[in-house]
Amino acid sequence: MKETLDQLMQSALAEIAGAASEDALQELRVRYLGKKGELTAVMKGLGSLSPEERPRMGQMVNTVKDRLETTLEETLQRVRAAAKKERLERERLDVTLPGRTSPLGTKHPISLVIEEISDIFAGLGFQVAEGPEVELDFYNFEALNFPKDHPARDMQDTFFVDDDILLRTHTSPVQVRTMLKHAPPVRIISPGTVYRCDSDATHSPMFHQIEGFMVDKGVTFGDLKGILTNFVNQFFGAGTGVRLRPSFFPFTEPSAEVDIACVMCKGQGCRVCKQSGWLEILGAGMIDPEVYRHVGYDPESISGFAFGMGIERVAMLKYGIGDLRLFFDNDVRFLQQFR
């Protein structure tokens, strides 16, 4: 039995020394020291020895067992240390390397245009006001002199939530709300989101608009033209031609469409301006007396003007963008151009 124990120990020590992983060491532990292991089988054979041999052989078995357990544990620690070192080497990070710059976002072109227009009118004494996007019929239509049978009140043009509740079709309701809260003089611009039932390459069911108005004593149509000409020259460039054409809006009288010399051909005539040399950018006019009556102003003692423009419209002209849908596609390649 002594020779058997010596052979078993030498064989086990050799295999333990050659083990390269925790799994291999675990298999050796089970093979030699498990319930059905080889050393366990030797221990079970002690009962067949004589009483004189049994204590001596039992001590030898325990010595071999202790030696194997100690060697297994030491080898396991070395294997774990080697594996950890290899992993750390593989995952090593050179802290002296320069960091990676995170890509920075940019402002959306619509936001850029709103900020630029707001800054221009702030320099002319206008303040920014805002209002709700879900609006009452009174503020969106009735107080702005839209008759009950006006086409804009039709569901084909307006998103109605209820009979008297809708998604505002313009930012003009802010004009009414402001005049109800404040006595003249007032100078306000109101940028915001508006909604209409329309969608194609040049129209979107949701878009952005800026309404502006000024009310005071002695405000004239000449003041309106002067302020809008000033805006055009700051926004599109000095010397940009401006013209006003007669038009109609329910809440202004007289009313005008404001055109600028085509930014593509400089007024010479091209496909964009349909050879006319002019591009429409906004509507404007003197505020109708009926609007004053709805807000409690005296139309005999004050006067004022209002104007409104689509932000996407002027942004497309300023940056030469041909399709309105690009503003809403979230294409990073498009948006990164506006820095």
Curated annotation (Swiss-Prot):
- Cofactor(s) needed: Mg(2+)
Among InterPro entries, the record links this protein to: aa-tRNA-synth_II (IPR006195), aa-tRNA-synth_II/BPL/LPL (IPR045864), Phe-tRNA-synth_IIc_asu (IPR004529), Phe-tRNA_ligase_II_N (IPR004188), Phe_tRNA_ligase_alpha1_bac (IPR022911), Phenylalanyl-tRNA_Synthase (IPR002319), tRNA-bd_arm (IPR010978)
| Record key words, sorted | Aminoacyl-tRNA synthetase, ATP-binding, Cytoplasm, Ligase, Magnesium, Metal-binding, Nucleotide-binding, Protein biosynthesis
Q: Name one GO cellular component term.
A: cytoplasm
Spell out the reaction equation it catalyses: tRNA(Phe) + L-phenylalanine + ATP = L-phenylalanyl-tRNA(Phe) + AMP + diphosphate + H(+)
Q: Name one Pfam family in it.
A: tRNA-synt_2d
A GO MF annotation of the entry reads: tRNA binding
**Record carries keyword ATP-binding:** yes
EC category name? ligase
Q: Which residues bind Mg(2+)?
A: 253
BP GO terms, sorted: phenylalanyl-tRNA aminoacylation
Assembly mode: Tetramer of two alpha and two beta subunits.
Name the HAMAP family on file: Phe_tRNA_synth_alpha1
The text of the family note is: Belongs to the class-II aminoacyl-tRNA synthetase family. Phe-tRNA synthetase alpha subunit type 1 subfamily.
Write down what this protein is called. Phenylalanine--tRNA ligase alpha subunit
**Source organism of this protein record:** Geobacter sulfurreducens (strain ATCC 51573 / DSM 12127 / PCA)
Q: What's the encoding gene here?
A: pheS
